[in-house]
């Protein structure tokens, strides 16, 4: 007997009872984005590998260890996208969206990284990102943070996420800091783990991200990035902090926050939570003013963020159990008796014509009225429309409220209006 084929480890199926909750959450996210004037862009899942090497950085963990890369039949190296910003910038350049233009874009979809699967972190994961091009002031950085704060309020999780900020300055400022940090680390190599020793020369800022307690203790005495910031970056960061204070958004400055992708400059931020166990990032981003030019476009200021939807869904479920998926079905049409099945189908179509916003399902599985009512309950229906031979003959229908148990008989021509009143 052939072995059953199963999903690849770390790449999950999401079943209807799960996707209903996802759809409600995504609907809120998209509604807020629309309210801030963002437009959707849809991007390929597969891109040329050099795009990510140039954008993310060849010595990052993502490029070195986590990308799904393969050669196509023409020998071209392709990669399943590990993140969305690089593809969004590529599309903006390719289609002329960024030349002397301001753009506010968002995207959503699956990303791929070869990581050890764990709760909230998978090899195929879903990410929603927002990117702004053509604006260089701290005000747009602040607005992106305000947008995300509005999400947390709408989802009922504001008390469970905290904002951390930092400025990593200009390319020149980071280079000066990098030299100082490497000099410090060289003096304390015996306290570094193997991973930090490897990063010390290839990507020393990533040592600041180490989860090793001994390394974190050592870094308390390390040079601070803020001491090396250029004047423009300092002014930009101070402006951002002032705007957030005026907006009533609490934050913590985390000088070890550097982000794991090489394209960032100036502002970087993360929304973090401890409500899923160890501290985890829910949403993160920052400025990447040099990336458009780096990928072949004209110099264009840019800022954006991305959020992992798996982790967001887990957080909503953990801290706001009252947040439920919308009802799968509003109305369930039940029939029993000679000639009633076709009448039920026709009635359902008339109701859909009159009230297209309703979620309506017709029973085609047979069974007596009791069994069909049980099916209606299983689907979460609030109302049952019941047709027997007598109702069909009289052009009537029984409307049953499945929550209160109350029912009434109406003319079929009146049912759409009645449903609108019952279901709001």
From Swiss-Prot:
Keyword DNA repair recorded: no
Family, similarity comment: Belongs to the class-II aminoacyl-tRNA synthetase family.
Domain of life from the UniProt record: Bacteria
EC code(s) of this entry: 6.1.1.21
Annotated compartments: Cytoplasm
SUPFAM superfamilies, A to Z: Class II aaRS ABD-related, Class II aaRS and biotin synthetases
GO molecular function, one term: ATP binding
Pfam families: HGTP_anticodon, tRNA-synt_His
Keyword line: Aminoacyl-tRNA synthetase, ATP-binding, Cytoplasm, Ligase, Nucleotide-binding, Protein biosynthesis
Summary of subunit composition and partner proteins: Homodimer.
NCBIfam families assigned: hisS (TIGR00442)
One Gene Ontology term, aspect cellular component: cytoplasm
Protein name in the entry: Histidine--tRNA ligase
InterPro entries assigned to the protein according to its UniProt record, in alphabetical order: aa-tRNA-synth_II, aa-tRNA-synth_II/BPL/LPL, Anticodon-bd, Anticodon-bd_dom_sf, His-tRNA-ligase, HisRS-like_core, HisRS/HisZ, HisRS_anticodon
Gene Ontology BP annotations: histidyl-tRNA aminoacylation
Catalytic reactions of this protein: tRNA(His) + L-histidine + ATP = L-histidyl-tRNA(His) + AMP + diphosphate + H(+)
């Amino acid at each position: 007997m052939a072995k059953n084929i199963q999903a690849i480890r770390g790449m999950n199926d999401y079943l209807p009872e799960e996707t209903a909750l996802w759809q409600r959450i995504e609907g809120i996210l998209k509604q807020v984005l629309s309210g801030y004037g963002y437009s959707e862009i849809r991007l390929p899942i597969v891109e040329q590998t050099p795009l990510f090497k140039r954008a993310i950085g060849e010595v990052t963990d993502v490029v070195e260890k986590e990308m799904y890369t393969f050669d196509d039949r023409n020998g071209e190296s392709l990669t399943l996208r590990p993140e969305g910003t690089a593809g969004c910038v590529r599309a903006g350049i390719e289609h002329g969206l960024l030349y002397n233009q301001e753009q506010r874009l968002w995207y959503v979809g699956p990303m791929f990284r070869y990581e050890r699967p764990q709760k909230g972190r998978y090899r195929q994961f879903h990410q929603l990102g927002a990117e702004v091009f053509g604006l260089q002031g701290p005000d747009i950085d602040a607005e992106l943070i305000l947008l995300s704060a509005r999400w947390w309020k709408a989802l009922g999780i504001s008390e469970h996420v905290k904002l951390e900020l930092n400025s990593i300055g200009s390319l020149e400022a980071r280079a000066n800091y990098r030299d100082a940090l490497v000099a410090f680390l060289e003096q304390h190599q015996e306290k570094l783990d193997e991973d930090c020793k490897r990063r010390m020369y290839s990507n020393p800022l990533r040592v600041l991200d180490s989860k090793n307690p001994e390394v974190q203790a050592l870094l308390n005495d390390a040079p601070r990035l803020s001491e090396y910031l250029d004047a423009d970056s300092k002014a930009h960061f101070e402006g951002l902090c002032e705007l957030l204070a005026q907006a009533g958004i609490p934050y913590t400055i985390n000088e070890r926050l550097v982000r794991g992708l090489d394209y960032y400059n100036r502002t970087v931020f993360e929304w973090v939570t401890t409500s899923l166990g160890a501290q985890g990032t829910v949403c993160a981003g920052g400025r990447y003013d040099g990336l458009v030019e780096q990928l072949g476009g004209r110099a264009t200021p840019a800022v954006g963020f991305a959020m992992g939807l798996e982790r967001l869904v887990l957080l909503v479920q953990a801290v706001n159990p009252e947040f439920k998926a919308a009802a799968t079905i509003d109305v369930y049409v039940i029939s029993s008796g000679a000639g009633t099945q076709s009448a039920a189908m026709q009635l359902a179509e008339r109701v859909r014509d009159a009230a297209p916003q309703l979620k309506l399902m017709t029973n085609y599985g047979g069974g007596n009225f009791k069994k069909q009512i049980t099916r209606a309950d299983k689907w979460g229906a609030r109302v049952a429309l019941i047709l027997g031979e007598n109702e069909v003959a009289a052009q009537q229908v029984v409307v049953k409220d499945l929550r209160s148990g109350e029912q009434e008989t109406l003319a079929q021509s009146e049912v759409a209006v009645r449903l609108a009143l019952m279901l709001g």
